[in-house]
Amino acid sequence: MMKIVRLLAEYVGGGHKAIIICGVDELGYLAKGEWHGHWDMGATYIPFLFRKLSSNSKTQVYYDGYSKDQGDEMTLGVLPVKVGEYFSVFDKDGEWNYQIKSIHYYVSE
């Protein structure tokens, strides 16, 4: 059964963090589908949508105005989603590494 979670991840270089709402499958991996998050840059927020197409695939990250063929690549979901795990985002400026600091599980009744 899929669980909905909120992840807090910090940029390894410091200065900003990611807050992500996504589904996690029964094995602890990011569930297939479209999910939402934002970068907390301190003074500004940058919202994004990301999408995972298959079980072992990397995800694509889309910002406001991006077309479906212009997404950045993200490795969240390649490994199980757990506290202490790292993931990377690759964009035109390089590689950005994040570490998951906390996970909040939403419970449905």
Name these PLM-found stretches:
Residues 12-14, 42, 53, 81, ...:
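A generic structural signal for short, solvent-exposed coil/turn residues
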